[in-house]
Amino acid sequence: AKNVFGIDAKNPFNSSMVGYAATLISFPNKISTWILPRSLRNNETEFLNLHEMLSFTFNNVEIPDSLTGATALEVFKYSNDGLMLDQIYQNNKIFSDASFVIVGWEWISISFLIGGLFLIITRVITWHSPTAMIGSICFLSLLFFDNGSSSSGGSAMLHLFGGATMLGAFFIITDPASSPETGKGKIIFGSIIGVLVYIIRVWGGYPDAIAFAIILGNFATPLINKFTFQTHES
């Protein structure tokens, strides 16, 4: 996805997303199924709040290196069996034990958001693509929220902070090699990816869809460049 096109950074597709998507399609069970060889704790595994995580980090406490489990988007997608949104949240600790959105993922997403804003402030990246992607996901989430009914696509907070939205918006779609070159083009590009992410998450077969949405968006990049450059010249 990258070396084939040389070292001049002219690869049409985001190489990281191509690698991830190829691995996911080729070995779906291997990278999505985690089998614990033994119980990590004597009691039922509990989610840690922020204070407990910081206490474990900065105190000399013996704990497992990591705990694996379903993401918030996976829990929501496969628990939405005719239940109201409030019922899904009450029945799953990943939601009910959260500080304000989703246990664990909320702080990860906020960290990516802070890092992304820093990149914009320091002008490492521009605001166009991230704002368009986040805005389109937020708009569709509000449009199809349906007051939390059993047919709801999930809240805007779930879609913004429950998956890889912030990572994708600030650190992946801003790849200069595979994204449009003009500001208007980047807005169109980010909007397309945001719409695709929401469609695949809600009606597709994958709970998160950043990689596939970005690759599909990369297909449109040459056309976006052509259209926006012609508009700029005219």
Residue spans of the language-model regions?
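Long hydrophobic alpha-helical segments that form multi-pass transmembrane helix bundles
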Residues: 9-113
